[in-house]
A protein has these predicted regions:
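Histidine-centered, transition-metal-coordinating active-site segments
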Residues: 1-24, 29-37, 66, 81-87, ...
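Short pre-active-site segment immediately N-terminal to the catalytic Zn-binding motif
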Residues: 35-47, 76
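A generic membrane alpha-helix/interface feature
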Residues: 16, 60, 73-74, 180
Length: 203
């Protein structure tokens, strides 16, 4: 199922450039960052790796533009909402029925962090019934995505690592595609200029 990441670009589509980030590279980078953090904190590295490698398995082609298009079409025809994290859970749990643990599925569902979050403290989740209710809420309430918080420290680490992984790579891709003319715009960045420095500084 990992092959579902093949040929899906991270942000920039329709560019013939081997250096542009793809989903497969992104999830590996998230996994590496999260495992490094998890190792320092004494967390479950197997759970971290499972969440990290599976978190974007339901993402659309053409990045978030593809997700936005599918969401608009899906909502217009069904009244429900499409979100890639919810679809990742659907792919693993419903379509392929892979018997994945509650903690792994929850980490995948709750990995989105594209909004301000100064603290990531695990939420309470005891059973699949409550998890399924949380998934269903995401289908019918567009704001439910913004309230998702992982139920484990491992899930929280992956969520933070996801942001660390794409901040620098998205900058690099923007420069390689000439969307940004020069690296000088990042020269004074507090988190670092290059991806490696950004990762090291944020970890």
């Amino acid at each position: 199922y990992y092959n579902r990441y093949a040929d899906k670009t991270q942000v920039f589509s329709f560019y013939k450039n081997d250096d542009i980030s793809h989903r497969a590279l992104h999830v590996q980078l998230v996994s590496r960052i999260a495992r490094n953090i998890g190792r320092m904190l004494g967390l479950d590295l197997d759970l971290i790796e499972a969440v990290a490698l599976g978190h974007d398995i339901g993402h659309t082609p053409f990045g978030h533009a593809g997700e936005k298009f599918l969401n608009e079409s899906y909502h217009a025809n069904t009244g429900r909402y499409f979100n890639h994290n919810v679809h990742s859970v659907r792919v693993l749990d419903k379509i392929f029925n892979l018997n994945i643990s509650l903690q792994t599925l929850d980490g995948i569902l709750c990995h989105n962090g594209e909004f301000e979050c100064k603290e990531c403290r695990p939420s309470k989740l005891d059973n699949f019934k409550d998890f399924d209710a949380k998934v269903e809420e995401c289908y019918i309430d567009q704001s439910a995505i913004d309230r998702l918080v992982p139920s484990t420290l491992e899930g929280c680490v992956v969520r933070i690592s996801d942001m660390i992984a794409y901040i620098g790579k998205d900058r690099q891709d923007a420069i390689k595609t000439k969307l940004i003319d020069s690296e000088s715009v990042f020269a004074e960045s507090e988190i670092g200029k290059y991806n490696a420095a950004i990762i090291n500084n944020l970890i």
